[in-house]
Amino acid sequence: MSAAKRDAQSLFPLFLKLSGRACLVVGAGAIAEPKIEGLLVSGAKVRVVAPRASSIVERWARAKRIVWRRRVYREKDLRGALLVIAATSSKKLHARIFRQARRCGILCNAVDDPPHCDFYYPAVVRRGAFQIAISTGGLSPALAQQLRKRLEREFGPEYGAWVAQLGRARDRLRKKNLNAESRRETLHRMAAGAVAKISRHRIHAPR
């Protein structure tokens, strides 16, 4: 088994809370745009370093949604960042950012450059709190995107509403004088009912 395949199969999946956390993006062009946008959606405090930026990134900077440092990357830009995204066309720069981030204990993702990644961006279906993340461990991002498009057709906005409804029910149960076992059984019964409802919806939904 190749090192790339071995790494892809040993990835640890998780969802990070980035709200209010500092994240660095090196690059401000078309490659960087979706990465910056994803961080903004997650509530991160985004710093961008690049001599030039796309019109969209410039607009985010003018609106103060991001901090744009209009110059080349320097190692000191890593200070205080939880993670860094290297989103340029230079593999040489990506390698340098990766090495420096490693020394600082900062996670790094270099776009389309798996050897210089501590983590990968999954393809995500978002329906409120209901999210499905698809990863191929960097081996085939195109496949992950195709699967995302298929799942987006199958899982509509109603799934987010159902999850929100279950969340409210869970909060109500927590306030009741139930022992842990009874509460767990009730929650699982409600979840099973939601799954059955989802299954019926999928059967009768137009294709």
For each predicted feature, which ranges?
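Short loop/edge segments at beta-strand edges and connector loops
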Residues: 50, 68-72, 112
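ADP-ribose/adenylate-binding Rossmann-like module
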Residues: 83-89, 94-121
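Glycine-rich, highly charged phosphate/nucleotide-binding loops
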Residues: 59-79
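Hydrophobic beta-strand scaffold residues
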Residues: 46, 68, 107-108
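Residue-level detector of alpha-helix initiation sites
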Residues: 30-31, 92, 138
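Hydrophobic, well-ordered beta-alpha structural blocks that scaffold small-molecule cofactor pockets
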Residues: 1-60
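An accessory alpha-helical subdomain
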Residues: 138-207
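E1/E1-like adenylate-forming module used to activate ubiquitin-like modifiers
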Residues: 110-160
